[in-house]
Swiss-Prot record:
Broadest EC class assigned to this enzyme: transferase
Keyword field: 4Fe-4S, Cobalt, Iron, Iron-sulfur, Metal-binding, Methanogenesis, Methyltransferase, Transferase
Originating species: Methanosarcina mazei (strain ATCC BAA-159 / DSM 3647 / Goe1 / Go1 / JCM 11833 / OCM 88) (Methanosarcina frisia)
Protein role: Part of a complex that catalyzes the reversible cleavage of acetyl-CoA, allowing growth on acetate as sole source of carbon and energy.
Pathway: One-carbon metabolism; methanogenesis from acetate
Name of the protein described by the UniProt record: Acetyl-CoA decarbonylase/synthase complex subunit gamma 1
EC assignment: 2.1.1.245
Molecular-function GO term, any one: methyltransferase activity
Assembly information from the UniProt record: Heterodimer of delta and gamma chains. The ACDS complex is made up of alpha, epsilon, beta, gamma and delta chains with a probable stoichiometry of (alpha(2)epsilon(2))(4)-beta(8)-(gamma(1)delta(1))(8).
Length: 470
């Protein structure tokens, strides 16, 4: 993005404040363009009226991310990679979380392919209010046989809606896979210095994204990318090679940094998403599969943090996948807006009029920790999430985001009446918000009980203190 102020975007807008975009003013809409919560297509006059055509084209150019965004696959599960504007998250945010593709090989028997594909497709890990998923399937042409590869590709796409990567350096094999995967927008892996012409022709013929590959040769990689761009191929992914150990790993790390820095600083010839291959850990001579999985996870972690936009992985063991998906979720959390849940009254279990009423803040990690501690111990209760702008209990109580007035307002907005909806007219407050006890009692005219400092101690606290003494 070449502009960073709403004022700069505003001058390319109709400036009529028509409200058709859903914003009250064109300046407000300009703000959504800068923070990337809105798109130029959200402004009907800008799109429909010919007099704005030049302004629209220039605005689109100025708003385009420094790193090109590439889409793999189709439909709801299509994977967007790239699209970043900064080297460091705190300067804006990172967009398009690192996509994780897990491999299958065409020399596996059909039942094994189907089983692995279903395992990849069905993977789900609940974390802070959302399900973490895997992103796609990389189909390796281990046989180097076009017919066998086509059969494997057909079997994969019949059993998943996830996007796929077709992996071979043999153009004939890739063509066989493309014929089967027509309309699925697969990613081609890969074009190198030996096959670039044939693979480039395939990318143009089938209109699919393609990886250009030059191991530890950034000049060669840039030349390939430039050649493909000049040929009219826009959706390019860079593979500088991923060496799993020693000096090769150090060089790989440095190459990722150089590529991304050059792209962000304006070198459009190499401003494309980067592919990492942590599965090379399995080629590092590590005999023990657990140790190989561990090292693969280490590599995945390194390149999630340092600009890997898409990864090819092998191990599906929980001890490998859980750190990988958790880290990606954490790194790609938007620092401009803390992860928060809706501020409202939630039911935990099957509460009744005799069940306890508690509150916490709407910071997602806090809320789901408390909710989990209550639910896992079979405590049926009412749990209110107070709007603290996504800040945890202790910080919100200290900073003024959690006050007696805020708690009262949250109860009123939730429609929950402590006098009629429960029989005990009591509220349990977090131990870290104990300073608010008196104020809450005055504001709500209820009995306030100070709970433990840690929600993990709630079961023991409930045994001793609930129901409240009359």
């Amino acid at each position: 993005m070449k502009i960073n102020s709403p004022l700069e975007a505003y001058k390319y807008l109709p400036q009529t404040n028509c409200g058709e975009c859903g914003q009250p003013t064109c300046m407000a809409f300009a703000s959504t363009l800068i923070d990337r919560s809105g798109k130029t297509t959200d402004c009907p006059p800008l799109i429909k009226e010919k007099k704005f055509a030049k302004k629209l084209a220039e605005l689109d150019r100025l708003l385009a991310p420094e790193i090109r965004q590439v889409t793999i696959g189709v439909g709801e599960r299509a994977a967007n990679i790239g699209g970043d504007d900064v080297l460091y998250r705190h300067k804006l945010t990172f967009f398009n979380k690192t996509k994780m593709f897990f491999d299958v090989a065409d020399n596996m028997d059909e039942a094994a392919i189907v089983e692995r594909v279903k395992k990849i497709s069905d993977y789900k890990k609940f974390y802070v209010g959302r399900n973490l998923l895997l992103d796609g399937v990389a189909i390796r042409a281990a046989s180097n046989d076009p017919a066998k590869f086509a059969t494997a590709v057909k079997k994969v796409i019949e059993n998943t809606e996830l996007p796929v990567i077709l992996c071979s350096f043999n153009p004939a094999v890739l063509k066989a896979g493309l014929e089967v995967a027509k309309g699925k927008n697969p990613l081609l892996y890969a074009a190198n210095k030996d096959n670039w012409k044939e693979v480039g022709e395939l990318a143009l013929e089938y209109n699919v994204p393609v990886v250009v590959s030059a191991f530890n040769d950034l000049d060669g990689l840039k030349t390939l990318a430039k050649t493909f761009a000049e040929a009219g191929i826009k959706d390019i992914v860079l593979d500088p090679g991923t060496y799993p150990t020693g000096k090769g790993l150090k060089d790989t790390f440095t190459n990722f940094l150089k590529i991304r820095r050059a792209g962000i600083m304006g070198d459009t010839e190499i401003a494309y998403p980067i592919m990492a291959m942590p599965l090379t850990a399995w080629m590092a001579g590590i005999a023990d599969p657990v140790s190989a999985s561990y090292w693969e996870t280490v590599l995945a972690s390194i390149f999630t943090i340092r600009y890997g936009d898409i990864m090819l992985l092998h191990s599906m063991e929980p001890y490998a996948t859980m750190p990988e998906v958790h880290l990606a979720e954490t790194i790609y959390t938007d620092p401009r807006s803390p992860v928060a849940v809706d501020s409202k009254m939630y039911k935990v279990g099957n509460p009744t009029a005799d069940s306890p009423v508690l509150f916490t803040t709407n910071f997602a990690l806090t809320y789901y920790t408390v909710e989990s501690d209550l639910a896992s111990n079979g405590i049926d209760c009412w749990l209110l999430a107070v709007n603290t702008d996504g800040i945890g209990v202790e910080a919100a109580a200290a900073g003024g985001q959690l006050t007696a007035d805020k708690v009262k307002d949250a109860f009123e907005k939730s429609g929950f009446d402590l006098k009629s909806d429960v029989t005990h007219n009591s509220v349990v407050i977090p131990g870290l918000a104990a300073r608010l006890q008196g104020d809450i009692e005055d504001k709500l005219n209820v009995k306030v009980m100070v709970g433990p400092m840690d929600s993990g101690r709630l079961p023991g606290w409930m045994e001793k203190n609930w129901p409240p003494k009359k």
